[in-house]
Regions:
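Exposed regions on extracellular, virion, or secretory-pathway luminal proteins
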Residues: 34, 65-67, 75, 93, ...
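A short beta-strand-loop micro-motif that forms or neighbors metal/cofactor-
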Residues: 43-59, 90-107
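Short, compositionally biased strand/turn segments
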Residues: 16-23, 67-70, 76
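Short domain-boundary/entry signatures in modular proteins, especially
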Residues: 60-71, 101-102
């Protein structure tokens, strides 16, 4: 008697993002998720602070020195859109913003 057992991987593949620009929704806590695949592709897993360029309703918004928040078990990062920017441009939760670029901030050099 032969028994065949199917073994499935526990690893879920949601989506692979490896290049910018990237469109993403703003969470209810005013944070934006940068997927782990994009973090690895850009080589920014070691960064604590970054300069981020966003596009929202035709406006290009430059955020300097935003803190990249991380979880314990993944390479994904999140950052909060500052209140001043949210109020000025009307960015709210559920809105779609495009991440145009993410680059190391000068703040990284000061903190190490």
């Amino acid at each position: 008697m032969t028994v065949r057992v199917s073994v499935r991987s526990r690893k879920l593949r949601r989506f692979e993002v490896t290049a910018l620009p990237f469109a993403v929704r703003v969470y209810i806590n005013n944070q934006v998720l940068v997927p782990a695949s994009l973090v690895r592709a850009l080589g920014i897993a070691h960064l604590r602070f970054a300069d981020v360029d966003l596009e929202y309703k035709g406006f290009v918004i430059e955020l300097r020195g935003v803190r990249l928040l991380r979880t314990r078990h993944t390479d994904a990062r999140q950052f909060t859109i500052p209140k001043r920017v949210r109020e000025t441009y009307g960015v709210g939760f559920g809105d779609v913003v495009r991440i145009l670029s993410i680059r190391p901030s000068i703040t990284n050099k000061d903190k190490d």
